[in-house]
């Protein structure tokens, strides 16, 4: 499998803690409902899953934000719940209700029936990865992704999204043995799923631990982080083009556990808006010439509802909070990838996103020229 050479490798260089001319950026959920062209494609597809399972449509919507904004990476258009769906739990999206599963995993029998899914059931995802990588034609790198074992387990036990995580936490505290069995299957499934995305052409992969932050201290390390480690240990290190594949881990609410996360086997840690980038850099960013992790984040997505000049001011504050950019091209050092602290809201005005992108690129360039 061969693809066009990469023209803009700024994102990958920052993942590798190499100096870049500006701070690269992409946005979580950058292909989505805030774009009128996305809504038009989704209407053609008829449903969210109709969109995600159709290679042509998934390719089209992945590229839409790049046509509008000079972003530095594309991310596969899919959903974290494709993996439990392939396990036979029956995923559906009701209009205005969000995802739900026909079957939930709540007792011994349910857990015994769980297995790493036949990856052929997810062929549509891998075909989309290859199709998107071809369509990008080397413009920017393509990021593949999955939910974390813990975050998937939350949906699998609750049967849908939850406000209080009552069912999954009840299982975790009353039958930790069952919880560990679910998480072990999930970790092996996620690793196989991400490896198949790498084989299909993904140039970086990201684990979304969206619900890790709801766990108590101690439980986070045992039930979330431990299984994210199990995923990372199994991931392929080299992509189809012979290049290394950076691994990004994002735990929403995880900023309080940076001491625990600094040693996990990944290249990039994502942060939400509650974390301070400069403090995170001091804990995990490393020194020039030494080991460390790149940081990704972390502006509050709600900043995008403010007028463009306020957006630009908040962008500058985030870039300043990271501190002096790494500029020595001869060695590695602390680097930053600009992103939101969580997914972009469907109500975001696209012109405010344009202001954000312009501010990130412009101001981060000026910081390197001081």
From Swiss-Prot:
| Keyword terms of this UniProt record | Cytoplasm, Decarboxylase, Lyase, Porphyrin biosynthesis
Q: Which residues does the UniProt site feature Transition state stabilizer point to?
A: 79
Q: How does it assemble?
A: Homodimer.
Q: What does it catalyze? A: uroporphyrinogen III + 4 H(+) = coproporphyrinogen III + 4 CO2
Question: What are its GO cellular component terms?
Answer: cytosol
Q: Which domain of life is it from?
A: Bacteria
Biological process (GO) annotations held by this record are: protoporphyrinogen IX biosynthetic process from glutamate
Q: What is this protein called?
A: Uroporphyrinogen decarboxylase
E.C. designation(s): 4.1.1.37
Compartmental location: Cytoplasm
Q: Identify the gene encoding this protein.
A: hemE
Record organism: Acidovorax sp. (strain JS42)
